Amino acid sequence: MKKLIFLFAFSIAVTNIFAQTDPNQIKKEGNDAFNAKNYPVAYAKFSEYLKQTNNQDSATAYYCGIAADEVKKYAEAVTFFDIAIQKKFNTGNAYARKALALDALKKTDEYVATLEEGLKVDPNNKTMIKNYGLHYLKAGLAAQKAGKAEEAEECFKKVIPLDHKSYKTNALYSLGVLCYNDGANIL
């Protein structure tokens, strides 16, 4: 009787080990879930597919990053966007989304470095331009309020080369205010 139970348990274990689902089926299920905006299922299916295929599919890694971001798994999203960047899939948007995930993780230095790196690769990406400009405008205004004129000036100068009319105008205006205040302090 003990041998029969052992044989039964052994056969179930062997069946479960070798009964892995076809990776293409998992990917299809992930795509269907993603298209239905069922991001938790999409993330689970895509990450399982990527594990089985050793992270070889850059498009799936990108979409897995989006799904991870939607379910607030930001560290995992960064990892998947890194895979997409390394494999050169939708590079500009992958950098932009990676930066947003880093911002959600409150990793400001990495966030800014990712935006700078991404702007070198895709200088016309509107999302990165917007986030980079907004970051430095806010940092410049905070430095200005704290009385750190040189730091504020450096922040505003980083916004000027960007191709965003509103941010460029705000940065130039803020630089003008800094100069005016410096002049007023001298008198």
Where are the model-predicted features located?
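Start-of-helix register in tetratricopeptide repeats
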Residues: 24, 58-59, 93, 127, ...
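Register position in tetratricopeptide repeats
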Residues: 35-36, 70, 104-105, 138, ...
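N-terminal leader/linker segments that initiate helical-solenoid repeat arrays
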Residues: 2, 17-63, 70-75
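Canonical tetratricopeptide repeat
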Residues: 62-63, 97, 131, 138, ...
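Short coil turns that delineate tetratricopeptide repeat
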Residues: 54-55, 89, 123, 164-166
